[in-house]
């Protein structure tokens, strides 16, 4: 007889190899066929809503690792919530207006300036939809479950109509105004930028010290002094109209040779050193406040430079006398307004100096630095020229430096509702907690929001102008434009004349002749996405405002979190979200930013093609996403190894349940052996720990708990010793069915617990599980802990056993290394435990040699009585020797009963009985 045919070895068709790149697309097809998203929504209908509102990625190009991290994190949460008593709809969105799309078309050879704006915009829309479709397929490939057939897209007419309503509501409350103000201006984009559209990079700039002669000392100065200013933007000097000093600072009049200079006393040493003064002498000092309204001369134009007081003046750098050009800086503008200065801005949209800068007209601002510096030298006003490298704002899209430039722009007044914004920040739950401080400080310090852009591809600012240039924004015009956009899309604004965009028969006292013109600027794209709480949450029946959660990268504190908060508080008085969760950026394995120049870009597509979506998802669960995270081939290799262990665990569980029918074969919990119930205690611990981790969005804790459970609790302990029972005993042996009962509970629970993270694998496992009826594991709820009367006592006792067992395993390892034994089944062990451990061992009814996976087990005396050759540990001494007897050909246990049965000479008594009773006809 072939004894191997009498062993109940694992049997399953569940494949050992994942082969995820091929298998996942087939699983996703099945999801599509069964309408998994709709089925989940149907099953959870009527439950409390949990709304995670998707911040819209920009529709341009393939998805990158940041997108993958973001969408997968969202998917974890939504999937978990739908399995724990919530209805959790997930509506994906796309941001589809703005400069990158215009640039993409220009790069493809589209001549924007040579066609009607409406025509160009149609091409932009087509391109945006192509990008949406491209990204949608890539997000689906990640296994993200969403309402992919009904996303929100910011260029869609219904969305644009709601955005117009948000604008109208803000205007009605007096929060929208037009003003001449310095804004971030990108000469390369020829448009104003919001704070969220700039990034800081190092730039080399001229650093100059310039003397301004005093023209009128107002009895405070004698008139022969010179103010010294410092600037890194010489090109702004043609726009200089004043000098700012701090009212509370002390200023020194310093004599150097025959000249007298005015600088802040605190900066005397620094300036003297920089300007290489020899024997400077402080003649006297004056308070900054005394210098107010004194007048200096512009160094190369025949005009005055007024001395003003400004709280923005610091002693961090420079001279304490600040060059002030109201057309080129926010602080300058504020001070200039206070003193009634004009807003002079001699730079055009392209960054070229105009005729208001005589002598430098036609020069690009950066190229004007040299001739202006030369002019200063020529007139004797240049005291020092050096070059410095400093952090300077750049256009985040064109990567080129930007300037501050005063232009007529539309603004949302943040000042008007700043206190409500700060209150809303306070009422929101922030994860990580520092998010609150970050957004609070941004809101506290930010200026008014410049919402106009001088571009073609965006939502028009719905303003009309009367014959006297008065802007017209009324409920009637706003509602009419919103309805037009809802019906025709915003392109109608560029296709029709102003009169055809106004309500029929519309009149206005400022237009007696009935003539009107329309605004040509469009809205900042942050106003687009920032209106989604109104256009999506409020509008869709399956969603609600405020959302439970916004989850984006940490760059969105100044972006979407901020713009959404601003529009929502302006319109509703409340934040659009109850909670905000942010994640870090994805870096390479060495912690460097990914860039084409370094060649270290990791793309999601490549990972999914080579390893599979579930490996990428498992990586997302493994990282501390609230900080910046790392990815590399080596890191992915480690994750793939963890995946292999999880998959092998599923395969082992399925294989050993091939002949198990839960309805007929399950053993009642009360009839399970202690060790089996202990395994259920460990399973309960896992269920509790994993669910708590999901609740707190701590996915790394989920990852580690599941990995440890599979490798330590199952593979290294329970499954290891269970093989001797599962394979060797008769099919219906009580102990075997008891173990199968536990394995079944473990399998079902584990499959559900991994579903949010490994949905493909979980749904691949699910149909193999005996007795399941649901079409997909996604249509089930998270497991509940199994009720056990003696759970706590079991845990205490068996945790102690596990501690002692680890000592035994160490002793066996030592004996193996010393060639006392081969495999552990060739060993006999005698334990000499502490009194406490002895009592515990004596109370165990299970076969201890099975639990230790040895052939013979004896309990000796106390730890003090152990022989010299025993291995001594904290809780026991262990004597390891060769087991007596022969090796059984069927179970490989060494036993003195081998040969006792005359028919089965090579089997131990246990195996001979099993074979006779079950396999002999």
Swiss-Prot record:
Motif ('HIGH' region): 57-67
GO CC annotation terms, alphabetical: cytosol
Cellular localisation: Cytoplasm
Top-level EC class: ligase
List of residues binding ATP: 596
Cofactor(s) recorded in Swiss-Prot or TrEMBL: Zn(2+)
The entry's keywords: Aminoacyl-tRNA synthetase, ATP-binding, Cytoplasm, Ligase, Metal-binding, Nucleotide-binding, Protein biosynthesis, Zinc
Span of the annotated motif 'KMSKS' region: 593-597
Pfam families the record matches: Anticodon_1, tRNA-synt_1, zf-FPG_IleRS
Keyword Zinc belongs to the record: yes
ATP-binding recorded as keyword: yes
InterPro entries linked: aa-tRNA-synth_I_CS, aa-tRNA-synth_Ia, Anticodon_Ile_BEm, Ile-tRNA-ligase, Ile-tRNA-ligase_type1, Ile-tRNA_ligase, M/V/L/I-tRNA-synth_anticd-bd, Rossmann-like_a/b/a_fold
Gene Ontology process terms (BP): isoleucyl-tRNA aminoacylation
Notes concerning its domains: IleRS has two distinct active sites: one for aminoacylation and one for editing. The misactivated valine is translocated from the active site to the editing site, which sterically excludes the correctly activated isoleucine. The single editing site contains two valyl binding pockets, one specific for each substrate (Val-AMP or Val-tRNA(Ile)).
Function, as annotated: Catalyzes the attachment of isoleucine to tRNA(Ile). As IleRS can inadvertently accommodate and process structurally similar amino acids such as valine, to avoid such errors it has two additional distinct tRNA(Ile)-dependent editing activities. One activity is designated as 'pretransfer' editing and involves the hydrolysis of activated Val-AMP. The other activity is designated 'posttransfer' editing and involves deacylation of mischarged Val-tRNA(Ile).
Protein name, as recorded: Isoleucine--tRNA ligase
């Amino acid at each position: 007889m072939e004894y191997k045919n009498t062993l109940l070895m694992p049997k399953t068709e569940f494949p050992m190899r994942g082969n995820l790149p091929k298998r996942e697309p087939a699983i996703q097809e099945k999801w599509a066929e069964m309408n998994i998203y709709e089925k989940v929504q149907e099953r959870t209908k009527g439950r409390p809503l949990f709304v995670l509102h998707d911040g819209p990625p920009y529709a341009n190009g393939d998805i990158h690792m940041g997108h993958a991290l973001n969408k997968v994190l969202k998917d974890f949460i939504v999937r978990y919530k739908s399995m724990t008593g919530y209805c959790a709809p997930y509506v994906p969105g796309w941001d589809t207006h703005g400069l990158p799309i215009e640039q993409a078309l220009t790069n493809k050879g589209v001549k924007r300036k040579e066609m009607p704006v409406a025509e160009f915009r149609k091409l932009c829309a087509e391109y945006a939809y192509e990008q949406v479709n491209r990204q949608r397929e890539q997000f689906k490939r990640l296994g993200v479950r969403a309402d992919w057939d009904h996303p929100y897209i910011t260029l869609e007419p219904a969305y644009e109509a709601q955005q117009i309503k948000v604008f109208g509501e803000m205007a009605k409350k007096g929060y929208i105004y037009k003003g001449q103000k310095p804004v971030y201006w990108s000469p390369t984009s020829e448009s104003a930028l919001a704070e969220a559209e700039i990034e800081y990079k190092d730039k080399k700039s001229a650093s100059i010290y310039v003397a301004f002669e005093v023209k009128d000392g107002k009895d405070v100065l004698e008139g022969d002094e010179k103010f010294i200013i410092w600037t890194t933007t010489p090109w702004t000097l043609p726009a200089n109209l004043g000098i700012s000093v701090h009212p509370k600072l002390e200023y020194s009049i310093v004599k150097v040779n025959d000249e007298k200079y005015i600088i802040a006393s605190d900066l005397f040493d620094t300036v003297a050193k920089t300007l290489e003064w020899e024997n400077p002498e402080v003649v006297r000092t004056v308070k900054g406040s005394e210098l107010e309204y004194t007048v200096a001369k512009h160094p190369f134009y025949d005009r005055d430079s007024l001395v003003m007081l400004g709280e923005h003046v610091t002693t961090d750098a420079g001279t304490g006398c600040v060059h002030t050009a109201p057309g080129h800086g926010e602080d300058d503008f504020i001070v200039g307004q206070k003193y009634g200065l004009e807003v002079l801005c001699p730079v055009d949209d392209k960054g070229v100096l105009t005729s208001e800068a005589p002598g430098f007209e036609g020069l690009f601002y950066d190229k004007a630095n040299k001739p202006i510096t030369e002019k200063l030298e020529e007139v004797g006003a240049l005291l020092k020229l050096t070059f410095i490298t400093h952090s300077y704002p750049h256009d985040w899209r064109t990567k080129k430096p930007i300037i501050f430039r005063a232009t007529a722009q539309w603004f949302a007044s943040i000042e008007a509702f700043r206190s409500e914004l700060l209150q809303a920040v306070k009422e929101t739950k922030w994860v990580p907690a520092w998010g609150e401080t970050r957004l609070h400080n941004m809101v506290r310090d930010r200026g008014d929001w410049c919402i106009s852009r001088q571009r073609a591809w965006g939502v028009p600012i719905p303003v009309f102008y009367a014959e006297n240039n008065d802007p017209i924004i009324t409920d009637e015009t706003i509602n009419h434009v919103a309805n037009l956009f809802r019906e025709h899309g915003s392109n109608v604004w560029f296709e029709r004349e102003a009169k055809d965009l106004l309500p029929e028969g519309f009149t206005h006292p400022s237009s007696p002749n009935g003539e009107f013109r329309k605004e040509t600027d469009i809205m900042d794209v942050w106003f687009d996405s920032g209106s989604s709480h109104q256009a999506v949450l409020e509008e869709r029946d399956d969603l609600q405002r405020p959302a439970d959660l916004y989850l984006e990268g940490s760059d969105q504190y100044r972006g979407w979190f901020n713009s959404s908060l601003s529009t929502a508080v302006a319109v509703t008085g409340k934040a659009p979200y109850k909670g905000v969760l942010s994640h870090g950026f994805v870096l390479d394995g060495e912690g460097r930013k990914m860039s084409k120049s370094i060649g270290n870009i990791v793309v999601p597509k490549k990972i999914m093609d080579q390893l599979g979506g579930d490996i990428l998802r498992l990586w997302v669960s493994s990282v501390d996403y609230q900080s910046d995270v790392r990815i590399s081939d080596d890191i992915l290799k480690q994750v793939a190894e963890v995946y292999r262990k999880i998959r092998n665990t599923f395969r082992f569980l399925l294989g050993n349940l091939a002949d198990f029918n839960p309805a007929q074969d399950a053993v009642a919990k009360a009839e399970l052996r202690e060790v089996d119930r202990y395994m259920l205690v460990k399973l309960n611990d896992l269920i509790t720990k994993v669910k708590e981790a999901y609740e707190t969005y701590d996915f790394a804790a989920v990852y580690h708990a599941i990995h440890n459970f599979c490798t330590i609790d199952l593979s290294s302990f329970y499954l290891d010793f269970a093989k001797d029972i599962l394979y060797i005993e008769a099919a219906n042996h009580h102990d075997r069915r008891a173990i199968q009962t536990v394995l079944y509970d473990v399998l079902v629970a584990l499959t559900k617990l991994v579903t949010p993270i490994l949905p493909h694998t979980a749904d691949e496992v699910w149909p193999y599980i005996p007795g399941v009826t649901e079409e997909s594991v996604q249509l089930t709820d998270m497991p509940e802990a199994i009720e056990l009367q003696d759970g706590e006592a079991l845990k205490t006792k068996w945790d102690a056993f596990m501690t002692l067992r680890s000592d035994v395993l160490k002793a066996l390892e030592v004996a193996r290394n010393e060639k006392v034994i081969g495999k552990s089944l060739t060993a006999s062990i005698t334990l000499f435990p502490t009194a406490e451990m002895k009592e515990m061992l004596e109370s165990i009814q299970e076969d201890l040699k099975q639990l230790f996976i040895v052939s013979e087990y004896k309990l000796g005396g106390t730890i003090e009585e152990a022989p010299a050759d025993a291995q001594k540990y904290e809780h026991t001494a262990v004597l390891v020797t060769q087991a007596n007897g022969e090796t059984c050909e069927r179970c490989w246990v060494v036993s003195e009963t081998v040969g006792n049965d005359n028919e089965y000479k090579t089997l131990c008594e246990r195996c001979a009985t099993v074979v006779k009773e079950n396999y002999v006809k």
